[in-house]
Amino acid sequence: VRTIDTHCNNLCNQAIRVEAIDEPGCGGANHKYNIIGPSRQMLGVGEVPTFGLNIRFQDGPLKEAGVNGVTNEALLAVLIDRMRGFQRGPFACDENAAVLTALETAMAILHARTQRRDKAGVEGTHGKAPGDGAFVDLEADAMPNEAIRVPIKQTGIVGMGADAAEAGA
């Protein structure tokens, strides 16, 4: 079990435990995560988490394994919907707008990746397409706009930071 703490920016998030609970697969990413709320005393039961969520991501190529878990795109769709809701509500702000733009950009990049792999005839398989493996490890301390600049340029999608300024966004 590997504990993830990149969300721990306030008391609420510090009380929520995020864990990768399996070993990384052949692509380098984990497939199973737990998100667990703080524990409370339950009469006759003991300490129990106030909530828990088990997330299982797609494991294996679609053409071989079938649909057996959620996708990054499905979770992004939830976050995009939530941020759009906040932007329609009384707490709309510049930060929420920036988050929404980043999430929508991430979704567009994932869609572009799927289209590139589909065009190469390898989508849904472990086969490699031109461009796979071209983007290697990011530094853990990379700034978010630096982290997405390379894939955005590779896909031709205009995003945040200097790329957006160059495009006149």
PLM features per residue range, with description:
Residues 1-42:
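Short, charged/polar N-terminal "headpieces" of proteins
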Residues 21, 113-131, 135, 161:
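Signature of extracytoplasmic/envelope-associated structural regions
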Residues 81, 86-124:
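Short, compact, well-ordered microdomains
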Residues 28-31, 40, 47-49, 127-130, ...:
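Polar low-complexity intrinsically disordered regions enriched in Ser/Thr and small residues
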Residues 1-4, 94, 123, 153:
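A detector of low-complexity, intrinsically disordered, Ser/Thr/Gly/Pro/Ala-rich segments
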Residues 30-86:
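A short, structured beta-strand/loop element
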Residues 132-169:
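Long, low-complexity intrinsically disordered regions enriched in Ser/Thr, Asp/Glu, Pro/Gly
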Residues 46-47, 98, 168:
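Acidic/polar, glycine-rich intrinsically disordered N-terminal extensions of enzymes
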